[in-house]
Amino acid sequence: MIPEQGEHKAFVQRNTNETKIQIAISLNGGHIEIPESIIGKKRVESDGVATQATSSQTIDIHTGVGFLDHMIHALAKHSGWSLIVECIGDLHIDDHHTTEDCGIALGDAFKQALGQVRGVKRFGFGFAPLDEALSRAVVDLSNRPYSVIELGLKREKIGDLSCEMIPHFLESFTEAARLTVHVDCLRGFNDHHRSESAFKALAVALREATSPNGTNDVPSTKGVLM
């Protein structure tokens, strides 16, 4: 849990000619809501797979791309976030704009919710297995956006999400959040498992990086981050 120097919540809207997105996030979990849904009657019977409400978290992901919903759900769950994501995108073209813009909007929301990097560990790493797959993620809340994502995916698609867009989502998130992120899938033969273990490993790393370090200091020799 992030030190209680603020609510660590954000509400972000991103509207372009390609996508319309709104995101509500609380990095410490708890109750969140959005002013008004943009999805409405566009919800379908398959919706609800990436929806979860517990005493500590509210998660509701609707991007229009099922496997992307699944990955963002895993990221939020294991990061300890409460997260609502709604997107209406130009999926009649392909999944590129929706996936990329959701990554950008989520990164922006994370950055706004985090605020000044103070009193946290700054660095975090995590390993996550999923059956035969094992992934490692290393994070720096650096204000220096850079990512190296090596998932080794072989399939063209998982569900309705192009495999090339899976690392690109993580790259887009990293850039907007202004993080340094390295994610590597170390082993595994099932691309679903490889991808999911990578998102879970990133969640573990983010949770550690944003956890208290026992001070109220900025964890940098520069004296400022973000």
Curated annotation (Swiss-Prot):
Pathway: Amino-acid biosynthesis; L-histidine biosynthesis; L-histidine from 5-phospho-alpha-D-ribose 1-diphosphate: step 6/9. It catalyses: D-erythro-1-(imidazol-4-yl)glycerol 3-phosphate = 3-(imidazol-4-yl)-2-oxopropyl phosphate + H2O. InterPro entries: IGPD_sf, ImidazoleglycerolP_deHydtase, ImidazoleglycerP_deHydtase_CS, Ribosomal_Su5_D2-typ_SF. GO terms for molecular function: imidazoleglycerol-phosphate dehydratase activity. Pfam families: IGPD (PF00475). One of its GO terms (biological process) is L-histidine biosynthetic process. Coiled coil: none annotated. Belongs to the imidazoleglycerol-phosphate dehydratase family. This is Imidazoleglycerol-phosphate dehydratase.
